[in-house]
Amino acid sequence: MLSLLISMWFGQYFIKWMKMRNISETQRDASIDPYGVDKKGVPTMGGIIILIATLVPCLLLGRLRNIYMLLMLGTTVWLGLIGFVDDYIKMNISKDGLRPIYKLVGQASLGLIIGLTLWLSPDAVIRENITTINKGTTEVVIHKSEPVKSTITTIPFVKNNNLSYSNIFSFLGRYRTAAGWIFFVLMVTFVVMAVSNGSNLNDGMDGMCAGNSAIMGIALAILAYVSSHIALASYLNIMYIPGSEELVIFLLAFVGALVGFLWYNAYPAQVFMGDTGSLPVGGIIAVTAIIIHKELLIPVICFVFLAESVSVILQTRYAKMGNRRGLKWRVFKRAPIHDAFRVKPGQIPSDFKILLNWPHGCWLESKITTRFWIVSIIMAALAIVTLKIR
């Protein structure tokens, strides 16, 4: 609630201040956005609202000695700074912004720091389920082990759903544990880069990224809560992660900040989050999933982000294949995928060969955003259901 109030209160003054200094969106593609002219001049860098509204309650109410809280705060500030620099360059130096290689290096560096911290910190531990049989009554008893360092992760929709990365390298003998942790660190780096970039691609319509991210944040808060509660973790037969209750505090602040920001970002937007918001939003979601050992659930929880990223990759590769043959090939009418739904008839040049020419017609921006939210709600519910359905 505090983050929601801060976001809504600070947001109105931030928007006025940005308008007074003419710090606004200047580049809009009106060919695919019928409201592009109206959006020109809308303040950007609104991610600052999200960052402040998330950080202030956590600094006031969170346990700042908790390793997971520190990782979340660090992720927010780190990616927020990268996004801020990118937005600043776009507005003042070059419309292309920060060079992609620099952004990727920044994201990869954060991923390595997160992975190595979870590997080396004595506070980042789990308590696994141990099953024993009472000899007198043949009763099956499930209890928790002592805190241990582990590369175990959860495989969704599988009955015996724990996988240790170290077991993948069992052929290495005594080196398998080290190999498992190295693989884990690389996995963390990839996940942080993938989800933060997916979030960045999803930030293309009013309310799109903020709404989807709030839904994902709620799902992760539920998963973090059951992982932090020893009784619930035992009942659901999942890993108990001591200290992860601080993630719940952080995520509730995060969701509140997003909802407050959405008050101003909903169609028609009064402010855009920019890379200052979209990069840390994706990073927060990624790091949370990693900490609670649910990184393999990311394709489910972040399905919308995944679809956006895959659509861009497919579009780029297919276009390059066509260029080699002197042809204009496209998989979708536009990419990221959300742009394909708002292309008007006749906007695609006649010499373009579209592989998936769908949908027919043009959807309103508000309808596209709402339907993407619905998809996110369905996938978030599916992720939560995996706690029981295996």
Predicted regions: what they are:
Residues 1-22, 50-81, 108-109, 113-136, ...:
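Alpha-helical transmembrane segments
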Residues 28-42, 94-106:
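Juxtamembrane helix-capping/reentrant segments at transmembrane boundaries
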Residues 72, 92-103, 149, 180:
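Short, amphipathic alpha-helical segments
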Residues 83-86:
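N-terminal amphipathic, basic-rich helices that act as targeting or association modules
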